[in-house]
Amino acid sequence: SEMCIRDRTIYDNRVFDSKGVADPSVEIQFGPNIKDWPEMSALPQNMLLKVVSEIHDPVTTTDELIPSGETSSYRSNPLGLAEFALSRKDPAYVGLAKEVQKAQKAIEAGEDAAEAFPEVKDILETVKESYADVTQDNLGIGSTIFAVKPGDGSAREQAASCQKVLGGWANIANEYATKRYRSNLINWGMLPFTIDKGELPFKNKDYIFVPDVRKAVEDKLTKIPAYVVNEGMKEITLTLGELTDDEREIILKGCLINYYRD
């Protein structure tokens, strides 16, 4: 029979074989929709949270937190995907979260948070009346959502990561629908707070100050004092619940990426 001779030319022209010829100095070229994860800060000593969504449905699904379907093409683009977070449930969420994030970005850049996001100026002054030692050097500013029972449904970690890249530092819930969603929050460096059922001591767009939150995580506290900040400071209790030592370290580092990097 006639011998079949394979022509590798087409394959060689389309596929790069780096075996034995790899050059680490060459920078990988990414397509326009492939983006790196933004840098994520370690857990600050003190934390100021703005509630940017308040959801009282009995259950909030991961598909409501970040819809599937048309968003799938953005899974390689964390910030692009985050634009769709809560879009079907609370369209105002993304804009509010990004406004708050301006303050944290200013802190990380060594700039004035109150200048970047003037709304926090009076809030910080109220905080300093009781906690005079709070400065930008020991403070993080971010967003949180409240939902009665978030995280039911599919296991998509983007339900948590989209909140993180928009400046989310925490969730507050009466309970979490799945251990998986709570674990995803932890892996993205977000505090999985719970609060007792009943009338909420805060509302959407309120600020919550959590003093010494880093020490609370280090010391394995489960009940964490916090304050709703309006004209004054109203004390509330947030529950952190059980965390393994590794989970605490992940939160302290800022996210699982930082945990492995360090």
Spell out what each predicted region is.
Residues S1-E2, R6-D262:
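Fe-S-dependent hydro-lyases/dehydratases of central metabolism
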